[in-house]
Amino acid sequence: ILDNVQANLANLSNAHFDKGLAGIGWAINILHEQNAVCGDIDDILYNVDAAVYKEITKHDANVGLSVTDGVNGYLVYLLSRMKNPKHDCNGVQHGLMKKATMRCVDTICGQAPSLFSGLTKDIYISAIWNFPWVFVLFKQTMDLGIYTEKIKAVIQEWSHYLRCSLPYYHLNRLSLCVSFAYLNTTLHSRELEGHVDFLLSNINFAGLRREVSEKIFNMNEGWFMASHLLAMALLYIPNNKSVYSELA
């Protein structure tokens, strides 16, 4: 399968995460970390790196926040590449990926504020919802030492909007809550902890069960991702919270 994929990489022009080069490169990178792919990872993914970089930095780019076909998906790919211990952190490709990562953060910072008003009106149940991914990826970007001060300042600037944001669906509330708790393992912000407490106190876990159908098996809307969110909540939400027993 991998031989066929790599042989056809040059024929793909779509750089998106769900059906394009970014997602394929992400999968190859994970397999390389597990020693299932041999060779220099920077050579193997050279063309993918170039395609993603071009897509992110072209002047007429008009990408949304989506994981599937937007800036969050590109950021997932870039961060996974730079975290690979076998990646050359001193090479030219690393410099380009770092630049592309900063461009992604800039794009998010420019787009997100105009969308905050829709947070409370979003009637689409989705575990891979755009907004939580922003905060998950911000944390991973800071962990690599990229744009740390800018991201801290942006979170502070957005704090008022986040404090007023209560998504309509309980699954989306849990998703946003987990992303805040995960981000706060790096920021250690009392204000962000307050956002976590606010969301937790407004999650009806019985209601959450009604929102998730055991008959849906896709990762975005089904029980699999809801279970994963609950597992992440147990990892990142302090066990002294009053709702911890309900999470468990």
Where are these regions (language model features)?
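Glycan-recognition and catalytic cores of secretory/periplasmic carbohydrate-active enzymes
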Residues: 1-248
